[in-house]
């Protein structure tokens, strides 16, 4: 249970002690040379709190070296609180909200939020799904209604999705999700993403749109549901997982961020 009054979110010594416990469960190691057993805490009135010395490479370090908190002038306890708030907020946390809760400038909160999100990014992620696993594919449209826009920005044609941004997503049931901002929903656009991000041994689930029917045979099995006739679930076949993801995404944009530009979508 989250307690905003916890010491690690309000005190530098407690925050440093918490991070050392989490990062060094078996004792401190040198982030410069990797030595595991020759680190010594530097003590004394003039010593910077949390400073360590490596007897192997003779370099100094703190627990923040090699982390997203390194070389930051923002207190560590505020970094820990910001990290927790972003990770615990199901619909996301805006920089304006962080700015108000942490007591830092908006510019600082914006920087912190981006650095934390970058630290959460997967490094060399493998494909979604795999043998016996199911991946759902679908697209959604993000953006305001044409009638609510200034007349200068309105599109001349009033058709579904006109003037909106397209987000194509892949969701691994009970697993990971990946989203892509795409210019259109044709098979030529979606196929390179699908075959690069999803293991060919996966079961693919989608709606009955033509672009998915073309790509379906490339996977172990492809099942569809026809929303046009009111079909949403047929045994194991459904896209409810990805629809739920899109619902959270849109509520987050509307309720937390209010507006997201094309660049940051």
Residue positions per predicted region:
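Residue-level recognition of single "structural anchor" positions
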Residues: 1-265
């Amino acid at each position: 249970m989250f307690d905003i009054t916890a010491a690690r979110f309000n005190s530098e010594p407690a925050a440093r002690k918490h991070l050392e416990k989490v990062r060094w469960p078996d004792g401190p190691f040198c982030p410069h040379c990797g030595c595991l057993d020759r680190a010594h805490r530097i003590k004394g009135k003039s010593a910077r709190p949390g400073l360590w010395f490596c007897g192997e490479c003779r370099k100094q370090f703190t627990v923040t070296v090699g982390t997203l908190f390194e070389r930051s002038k923002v207190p560590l306890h505020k970094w820990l609180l910001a990290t927790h708030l972003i990770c615990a907020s199901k619909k996301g946390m805006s920089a304006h909200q962080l700015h108000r809760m942490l007591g830092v400038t908006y510019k600082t909160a914006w920087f912190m939020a981006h650095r934390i999100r970058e630290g959460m990014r997967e490094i060399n992620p493998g494909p979604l799904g795999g043998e016996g696993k199911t991946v759902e594919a679908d697209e959604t449209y993000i953006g305001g209604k044409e009638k609510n826009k200034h007349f200068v920005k309105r599109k001349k044609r009033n058709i579904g999705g006109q003037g909106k941004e397209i987000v194509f997503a892949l969701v691994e049931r009970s697993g990971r999700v990946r989203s892509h901002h795409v210019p259109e929903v044709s098979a030529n656009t979606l196929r390179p993403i699908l075959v690069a991000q999803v293991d060919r041994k996966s079961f693919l689930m989608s709606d009955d749109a033509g672009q998915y029917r073309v790509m379906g045979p490339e996977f172990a099995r492809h099942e569809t549901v026809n929303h046009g006739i009111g079909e949403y679930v047929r045994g194991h076949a459904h896209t409810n997982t990805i629809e739920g993801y899109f619902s959270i995404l849109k509520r987050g944009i509307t309720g937390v961020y209010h507006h997201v530009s094309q660049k940051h979508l």
